[in-house]
């Protein structure tokens, strides 16, 4: 399978928090959310939250997977 040129885009939404800083989430993945004192910190925290959610779902899928299923890890480059 040729993944060259494949791009997956997610829309990050950063909202000012009443107490200061920002809350943030991905529109396409509402279960991925975070916060930060600055936009840069919020973005870094949101990407960390995405990694944690992906790791969680990967482990859960492996626990309940179908015997004999073929798994292939696909690497997607961020731009």
Question: What is the meaning of each model-derived region?
Answer:
Residues 9, 25, 34:
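Conserved beta-strand segments that form the floor/walls of ligand-binding pockets within enzyme
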């Amino acid at each position: 399978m040729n993944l060259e040129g494949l791009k997956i885009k997610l829309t990050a939404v950063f909202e000012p928090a009443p107490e200061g800083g920002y809350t943030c989430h991905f529109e396409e993945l509402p279960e991925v959310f975070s916060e930060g004192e600055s936009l840069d910190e919020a973005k870094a925290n949101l990407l960390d939250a995405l990694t944690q959610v992906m790791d969680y779902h990967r482990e859960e899928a492996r626990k309940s997977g179908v015997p004999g299923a073929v798994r292939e890890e696909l690497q997607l480059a961020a731009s």
